[in-house]
Design a protein with these regions (language model features):
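Short coil-to-beta microelement around the adenine-binding A-loop and adjacent beta1/P-loop entry
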Residues: 16-17, 71
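ABC-family P-loop ATPase nucleotide-binding domains
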Residues: 81-138
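The feature captures the beta-strand-to-loop junction immediately N-terminal to the Walker
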Residues: 32-37
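Catalytic Walker B motif of ABC-type/P-loop ATPase nucleotide-binding domains
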Residues: 150-154, 159
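Conserved ABC transporter NBD signature motif
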Residues: 51, 55-68, 72-73
Length: 162
């Protein structure tokens, strides 16, 4: 079974197509990037996958229609928006504690292993971080959740090129 299947996925904004009968299939375990210019429909496709926007056509995420099974899918899907925000007062350790307390599939050990490869430390507050460091924290938190589908909108925005 494919993780995500779209058939003739369409969405218009003010009569202008953002997605025009797009079809694709993504198999489990695959990493897929959507590449295109601004306004090409990348974020609209991600919002459709998450059940955050109405669309025409067929879309199946883990065998479910995100329009009707959004709540159920959120147990299996993790998402970082391109404008994901953390409270400026929160410390790295507090963010980890929070996610550990609310998500049953979160692995503190995985998160700490990801963060060990960065310059972030447990007592550091978000207000002391660069944009790229905040992205690193978000990625560590989300990647440490045992999700079947990760949806990352502009996940490298603000990261340093290595």
């Amino acid at each position: 079974m494919s993780a995500i299947v779209a058939r003739n996925l369409s969405k218009k904004y003010g009569g202008k197509p953002a997605l025009d009968e797009v079809s694709f299939s993504i198999e489990p375990g695959r990493i897929v990037g959507l590449i295109g210019p601004n306004g090409a429909g990348k974020t609209t496709a991600l919002k459709a996958i998450l059940g955050l926007t109405a669309f025409e056509g067929e879309l199946s995420v883990l065998g479910q229609d995100p329009r009707v099974a959004r709540d159920k899918l959120m147990n299996e899907v993790c998402f970082i928006a391109d404008v994901a925000i953390l409270p400026r007062w929160i410390r790295v350790s507090q963010a980890i504690d929070f996610v550990e307390g609310v998500h049953p599939r979160f692995s503190r050990a995985k998160c700490e292993a990801f963060l060990a490869r960065t310059k972030l430390h447990a007592k550091q507050r978000v207000r002391e971080m660069s944009k790229g460091m905040i992205v690193q924290l978000h990625l560590a938190l989300v990647m440490a959740i045992d999700a079947k589908v990760l949806v990352l909108d502009e996940p490298t925005l603000g990261l340093d090129i290595l």
